[in-house]
Swiss-Prot record:
<feature type="transmembrane region" description="Helical">
    <location>
        <begin position="389"/>
        <end position="409"/>
    </location>
</feature>
<dbReference type="GO" id="GO:0005774">
    <property type="term" value="C:vacuolar membrane"/>
</dbReference>
<dbReference type="GO" id="GO:0032974">
    <property type="term" value="P:amino acid transmembrane export from vacuole"/>
</dbReference>
<feature type="topological domain" description="Vacuolar">
    <location>
        <begin position="263"/>
        <end position="318"/>
    </location>
</feature>
<keyword id="KW-0813">Transport</keyword>
<dbReference type="InterPro" id="IPR050495">
    <property type="entry name" value="ATG22/LtaA_families"/>
</dbReference>
<feature type="topological domain" description="Vacuolar">
    <location>
        <begin position="439"/>
        <end position="485"/>
    </location>
</feature>
<keyword id="KW-1133">Transmembrane helix</keyword>
<keyword id="KW-0072">Autophagy</keyword>
<feature type="transmembrane region" description="Helical">
    <location>
        <begin position="131"/>
        <end position="151"/>
    </location>
</feature>
<dbReference type="InterPro" id="IPR044738">
    <property type="entry name" value="Atg22"/>
</dbReference>
<feature type="topological domain" description="Cytoplasmic">
    <location>
        <begin position="152"/>
        <end position="153"/>
    </location>
</feature>
<feature type="topological domain" description="Cytoplasmic">
    <location>
        <begin position="340"/>
        <end position="352"/>
    </location>
</feature>
<comment type="function">
    <text>Vacuolar effluxer which mediate the efflux of amino acids resulting from autophagic degradation. The release of autophagic amino acids allows the maintenance of protein synthesis and viability during nitrogen starvation.</text>
</comment>
<feature type="topological domain" description="Vacuolar">
    <location>
        <begin position="120"/>
        <end position="130"/>
    </location>
</feature>
<feature type="transmembrane region" description="Helical">
    <location>
        <begin position="418"/>
        <end position="438"/>
    </location>
</feature>
<protein>
    <recommendedName>
        <fullName>Autophagy-related protein 22</fullName>
    </recommendedName>
</protein>
Length: 528
């Protein structure tokens, strides 16, 4: 074989790997484009409305349980409660939605922990892509099923939402864990092995920002189409369910390209290889006759691996700082959206169409925030990643502060419908920037080879706060029957996060993560 032929073969292999790396990034964009409408449109707008609507239809007046909630008998100011478990307990109709959110996130956390260890153990990008598609199909079909329920099936509504949200949690963790792998694969292929570490930071930020913008773009398209669907069903009880149906179909269809796009750039070591199974087994000696781990051990590996990762995270100062800060931030930012929807419906009596318009405003400005904040504002003013996060939090804290003003003033402080439209713009900018920056920051400070497990920690921190936040707001609403009091809770949390974020040093965190990855036992590294 001639020297020229060998060069041609090497060039062909290099081009093949570059194409694979580029396709993986396109597949990552498809993940964001297909699934983002579920959380932005369904979870943030439609599901809260459906839960409150079903609760109101099946609820009664708080002061007289013999009077249906939607009855014209009694005062308009009478609050409503929903009887659960054969009327053993009664909860505020707004609180019911919040309690379901908490329960769904608890289920999501359990399934995320179980699955994240499996994908790290398997060590194949293609397998992770299949996980995205499998759970996406189940989540999409559960969303479609929600659109077919009648208003008496309140427990079925809660159950299907819990399943769909659990599936979204899995693909969110696995999808985010693929980002640093795709970035490094792309740089390795383009530079044929060697690349500058600083390029990882910039490329991660760019791809993360584009992914967030694409996700919000898809959510915007879904919301605009949903406006026409809801308008065509105006006056019907099924108007929101038509929008939910469209979200489910969108999720199902647009995730399919990932089947062909996401693949291994290099041939991975097979997960069922006896050496890999032996090296990675959390239970040495418990492989089957073929040297393979059984599914019981695969599932438990996620919990064992997570426990080990928390032990390692204690050695990573900046990972711990970020996770503590994120727990506080997420508790406020994620809960405030669903609370605002319930507040708008219950207190301001806004129509479904108006709430979708607010959601569209939020999505448009989230796209701007995801694109402008990391790529222009942070660059222009030379903010560090941690500084950028702090400025976003300060910006976002105005929203609950403005809601608090409603206790003291009658003219403003979320007393009128138009104020919700203005705050939607404000919230969207902060949400988009936070989504793009937080993902890229955390991906920079996790040990190479442990992306899925550490992003599982990130998700668990996020979801742990999302279990607590809605639950506490639900208790507060049950006690006061006034959801406005939740704004005190949100404002306090955002203020508490600032001094924690001020301690974050991304460069130090990245250095410590790389050092830790070098000293991890061979059995705990991903075998590339």
């Amino acid at each position: 074989m001639s020297y020229g032929t060998i060069n041609d073969m090497n060039e062909s292999v290099t081009n093949y790997r570059i194409k694979k790396a580029q396709n993986n990034i396109k597949g990552w964009y498809a993940y964001s484009f297909s699934s983002e409408p579920f959380v932005v449109s369904a979870v943030s707008t439609y599901i809260p409305l459906l839960l409150q609507q079903f609760a109101s239809i099946n609820g009664v007046k708080v002061h007289d349980h013999s009077i249906p909630c939607l009855s014209e008998t009694g005062s308009d100011s009478d609050k409503c409660v929903l009887g659960l478990f054969n009327n053993r307990i009664f909860v505020d109709t707004s609180s019911f939605a919040l309690y379901v959110f908490s329960l769904s996130v608890l289920f999501q956390t359990i399934i995320v922990i179980s699955v994240s260890g499996i994908v790290d153990l398997w060590g194949s990008v293609k397998f992770k892509g299949r996980i995205l598609v499998w759970f996406g199909i189940v989540g999409a079909l559960s969303t479609v099923a929600i659109s077919k329920l009648n208003d008496t099936q309140i427990y079925s509504l809660a159950g299907l939402y819990i399943v769909a949200n659990g599936c979204f949690g899995v693909i969110n963790v696995v999808g985010n864990s693929l980002l640093p792998i795709f970035v490094k694969d792309s740089l390795k292929c383009q530079s044929q092995g060697a690349y500058e570490p600083d390029k990882v930071d910039s490329l991660t930020t760019v791809i993360s920002g584009r992914g967030a913008s694409l996700g919000y773009s898809s959510a915007l398209i879904v919301q605009i189409v949903s406006m026409f669907l809801v308008a065509s069903k105006k006056g019907s009880k099924q108007d929101v369910q038509v929008a939910v149906l469209f979200v489910g179909i969108w999720w199902f269809v647009w995730q399919l390209p990932m089947i062909w796009l996401i693949d291994d750039v290099t041939i991975p070591i097979r997960a069922d290889d006896s050496t890999l199974a032996s090296a990675r087994s959390p239970y040495p000696g418990e492989q089957d006759a073929l040297g393979q781990l059984n599914w019981k051990n695969y599932l438990s590996y996620g919990w064992v691996s997570l426990f080990e990762s928390f032990k390692h995270a204690r050695l990573l100062k900046d990972v711990m700082i970020f996770l503590i800060a994120w727990f506080i931030i997420s508790d406020s930012i994620t809960t405030i959206n669903s609370t605002a929807v319930l507040f708008s419906k219950a207190e301001l009596h806004m129509s479904t169409l108006n709430l979708i318009m607010i959601s569209v405003l939020t999505v448009v400005n989230a796209m701007l925030g995801a694109f402008m904040i990391p790529q222009f504002l942070a660059t222009k003013f030379r903010w560090t990643s941690s500084q950028t996060l702090m400025y976003i939090i300060i910006w976002a804290s105005f929203i609950p502060f403005y809601g608090i003003l409603g206790f003291f003033f009658n003219a403003f402080g979320l007393k009128h419908k138009f104020e919700m439209f203005l705050l939607a713009i404000w919230y969207g900018l902060s949400l988009g920037g936070l989504s793009a920056v937080s993902r890229s920051v955390f991906s920079l400070i996790v040990p190479p080879g442990k992306e899925s497990t550490f992003f599982s920690m990130f998700s668990i921190t996020d979801k742990g706060s999302s279990i607590l936040g809605p639950f506490l707001v639900g208790l507060l609403t049950d006690k006061t029957h006034n959801i406005r009091y939740s704004f005190y809770f949100f404002f306090l949390l955002l203020m508490l996060s600032l001094p924690v974020l001020n301690c974050l040093d991304v460069k130090r965190g990245r250095r410590e993560a790389e050092e830790l990855s070098q000293v991890l036992p061979e059995s705990e590294r991903r075998l590339d």
